[in-house]
A protein has these predicted regions:
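Bacterial Sec-dependent N-terminal signal peptides
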Residues: 1-22
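Catalytic-domain carbohydrate-binding cleft regions of carbohydrate-active enzymes
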Residues: 21-346
Length: 346
C-alpha cells in the first residue's frame, strides 16, 4: 500500500513539474471594446445604442465569468453614462470598485497624438484623470490608443510627465513597409519608448487586433500569440481581444475561451489582465535590462495618414484655437494677479 501511495505521489509531482516547465511563455489578455465616439454615426447614436450596449453586455459577462476583466477608455463616455444612464452607471462604479471593469487611457477622449499641441494633450489627460479620481477613486496608468494613425516623438515625454508608465496600440501592425529600413514593421513588440527629454515609458507596439475573437478555443496553445511571445521580453505577449469601433463586449465564446484557458496545460500562461498590469509588473523599468529601447517617432505609412495633409484647414483652425485658449488663460492669470477678475478655474 505504501509503495502504491509513493508511486501516486511521485507521478503527481512529476506532472506538476512538467506543467510548470511548460509555462515558459506568458500572455496578458486584455478584453476591450474599442468605441469611436463619432465616425460613421453621430453622437446621439453613440449614446442611445452603442454606449448602453457596452454596459449591459459586460454586466451579463461579469455575472457568468468570475475571471473576466473589461477595459474601457474615455472619460467622455463615462460622463455620458452618468448623465443618460444613472442606474447602469452605478453598476459600472460597483464593478470598477470590484476590479472587474477597468478604466484605461487616462484622457478625456482618445486623441490624435500628432496634430494637437503638447499643452492640449496634457489638458486632455488632466481632465480625464480628474474625472476618474472624482467619480471612481482611481486613476489610469497608461496611454491607450488602439486605433490612431501614428505616434509622435513627444508622446512618451508627455505621458511620463503626466505620471503615466505605459502605452499600447495595435495600429503599427498595419504598416505596409518595414520600419526605417529594418526587417519588421515596428522596433519591437514590447519594450521601452524613449522621448525627446530621455523620459521612458513601457510600450506595447503589437497588441494584436482589438477585434480578435476566439471560438471555444484553448488560448494557451494559440500559435499566433505564442509566436509574439517568443519575440517579446521574457517570452511575454500582450494581446487585445474584443470588438471594434461601436463598443459592446467580447463575444461569449471568446470569454468562455479565456476562462477555459486560465487553467489549461498549454505552453502559454494566460492572464486575464487589466490593460496596465504589464507595466506595473515590470516597474521600475531600470530593473529589467531585457526590455529593448527605442528612441524616435512611430509613424504610419498607410490608412488614415492622408488626413494630415488633406485637412489643412482643420489643422489651421485647431492650432488657432489652441493659441487663443493659451492667450485667454494667460490673460486670466494676469487679471487675477492685478486684482481684477477671479481666475475661472471651473
Amino acid at each position: 500500500m505504501k509503495k502504491i501511495l509513493c508511486c501516486i505521489l511521485s507521478l503527481f509531482c512529476f506532472v506538476q513539474i512538467l506543467y510548470s516547465q511548460q509555462k515558459e511563455y506568458k500572455a496578458y489578455l486584455v478584453a476591450t471594446a474599442h468605441f469611436d465616439t463619432q465616425w460613421n454615426w453621430d453622437v446621439r447614436e453613440s449614446i442611445d445604442d452603442y454606449l448602453h450596449r457596452t454596459m449591459v453586455q459586460n454586466f451579463w459577462l461579469f455575472e457568468r465569468f468570475p475571471n473576466y476583466i473589461f477595459n474601457f477608455e474615455s472619460a467622455q463616455k463615462y460622463a455620458w453614462m452618468k448623465e443618460y444612464y444613472p442606474h447602469e452607471y452605478e453598476l459600472v462604479k460597483k464593478y470598477i470598485k470590484a476590479g472587474r471593469w477597468n478604466v484605461v487611457g487616462s484622457a478625456w477622449e482618445a486623441t490624435d497624438p500628432n496634430i494637437p499641441s503638447s499643452e492640449s494633450f496634457f489638458r486632455n489627460v488632466l481632465l480625464g484623470q480628474e474625472f476618474y479620481k472624482k467619480e471612481f477613486g482611481v486613476k489610469s496608468n497608461d496611454i491607450y490608443l488602439p486605433d490612431c494613425f501614428g505616434f509622435g516623438y513627444t508622446l512618451p515625454t508627455i505621458a511620463a510627465h503626466c505620471g503615466l508608465i505605459g502605452f499600447s496600440t495595435q495600429k503599427l501592425q498595419w504598416r505596409k513597409n518595414p520600419y526605417f529600413g529594418e526587417k519588421e514593421k515596428m522596433p519591437f513588440k514590447i519594450g521601452l519608448w524613449q522621448g525627446l527629454d530621455g523620459a521612458r515609458i513601457m510600450a506595447v507596439l503589437d497588441a494584436g487586433g482589438y477585434g480578435t475573437s476566439y471560438y471555444y478555443d484553448d488560448i494557451s496553445i494559440n500559435r499566433r500569440i505564442l509566436e509574439r511571445a517568443k519575440l517579446g521580453p521574457d517570452n511575454t505577449a500582450y494581446s487585445y481581444y474584443g470588438v471594434g469601433d461601436r463598443g459592446g463586449s467580447p463575444t461569449l465564446p471568446s470569454v468562455y475561451s479565456l476562462e477555459k484557458s486560465l487553467k489549461a496545460d498549454g505552453p502559454l500562461e494566460i492572464i486575464s489582465a487589466k490593460a496596465g498590469q504589464i507595466y506595473e509588473d515590470y516597474y521600475p523599468f531600470e530593473k529589467h535590462p531585457e526590455l529593448p529601447v527605442y528612441d524616435g517617432e512611430l509613424l504610419m505609412d498607410v490608412h488614415g495618414v492622408g488626413c494630415y495633409t488633406s485637412q489643412a484647414a482643420m489643422k489651421h483652425f485647431n492650432r488657432r484655437n489652441e493659441h487663443l485658449a493659451d492667450a485667454a488663460e494667460r490673460a486670466s492669470v494676469v487679471a487675477e494677479t492685478l486684482g481684477g477678475l477671479e481666475y475661472p478655474s471651473d
